[in-house]
From Swiss-Prot:
Gene3D superfamilies: 3.30.1440.10. The gene is MRPL7. This is Large ribosomal subunit protein uL5m. InterPro entries: Ribosomal_uL5 (IPR002132), Ribosomal_uL5_C (IPR031309), Ribosomal_uL5_dom_sf (IPR022803), Ribosomal_uL5_N (IPR031310). Component of the mitochondrial ribosome (mitoribosome), a dedicated translation machinery responsible for the synthesis of mitochondrial genome-encoded proteins, including at least some of the essential transmembrane subunits of the mitochondrial respiratory chain. The mitoribosomes are attached to the mitochondrial inner membrane and translation products are cotranslationally integrated into the membrane. It comes from Saccharomyces cerevisiae (strain ATCC 204508 / S288c) (Baker's yeast).
Length: 292
């Protein structure tokens, strides 16, 4: 009986045929299209509703009440502001613009234009008040800077919690940008927080401020007429003692043994400061002093 043996030899040659991987000419899109696999199954149809649908378990009601501040502006203030700021035969007042070079010298070629006369930047044009550009509220920015946070950074976290308690919105931390040895300030330290309010959150904060907080401050004169950035922005501040008059803080004074003052910047669509002051006076903000 003959026996056969199979002997295998290792081949170290690189010329042997190897299978090549296929190359598709169609670009893949499976990583670009997001597929919710939970909706492909026929099970649990009650979980497939959109979160904006009231039948969805994840539905969150948002518009639970009317915006009294916005309704007051639309029903009363808007028409009054149009009448107060009306000027017969008013024309557009041109703001300061950049100036071109005379061209007498060859060095004037490709040179950037000169700054406006008497200003480092261009100023916008002032248009007459019409039905399309009546001054209105845009946003409220609250800034809380804690000087003691350079030694104890936990105070900056407390200031952020104070803003969140008062406004109901999540604040953003503020960090120092430079090193100032004389102030013992280091770059990158959290020094406070700020929050920007729009819509109903802004209306709720302004209503609480004008109806509850400011009337409880003793000998409160109001906002200075010198306040303003010349383009419809009004700024003022509240001390640490004034913050205790907010109902969110007053109801839990034991939880807030230390409060922090804050700066409030009200941004409006007014073109001049006196137009912004007229708008805010309609929301019961008092002003005092001489104008600029």
């Amino acid at each position: 009986m003959q026996r056969f043996s199979l002997v295998t030899h290792r081949s170290f040659s690189h010329s042997c045929v190897k299978p090549k991987s296929a190359c598709s000419l169609v670009k893949p899109v499976h990583h670009l299209v997001k597929i919710d696999k939970s909706k492909l199954s026929p099970r649990f149809p009650e979980l497939k509703y959109d979160k904006s649908d009231i039948r969805s378990p994840g539905f969150k009601p948002k518009d639970t009440h009317a915006d009294r501040l916005n309704d007051h502006y639309l029903n009363t203030l808007q028409s009054d502001l149009l009448l107060i700021n009306y000027s017969h035969n008013a024309a557009v007042v041109k703001g300061l613009k950049q100036r071109a070079w005379s061209g007498d010298s060859p060095y004037h070629l490709n040179r950037p234009p000169k700054n406006p006369r008497g200003s480092k930047a261009q100023l916008p044009d002032i248009h007459p008040i019409k039905w399309s550009n009546i001054p209105g509220l845009e946003s409220v920015v609250i800034n809380c800077f804690v000087r003691e946070a350079r030694e104890n950074q936990l105070l900056a976290i407390t200031a952020a919690l104070q803003l969140q308690q008062i406004t109901g919105c999540k604040p953003h931390p503020i960090f120092s940008k430079n090193d100032v040895p004389t102030w013992k300030l280091r770059k990158g330290h959290q020094m406070g927080a700020k929050v920007e309010l729009k819509g109903k959150e802004m209306s709720q904060f302004l209503s609480t401020l004008t109806e509850i907080v400011l009337p409880r401050i003793r000998e409160y004169k109001g906002i200075s007429n010198q306040s303003g950035n010349r383009f419809g922005g009004i700024s003022f501040g509240l001390t640490a003692e004034d913050i205790k008059f907010f109902p969110e803080i007053d109801a839990n004074q034991d939880s807030w043994p230390k409060t922090f003052g804050m700066h409030i910047n009200i941004n409006t669509s007014a073109q001049l400061d006196y137009q912004a002051r007229t708008l805010l006076s309609g929301f019961q903000f008092p002003f005092f002093g001489e104008e600029k």
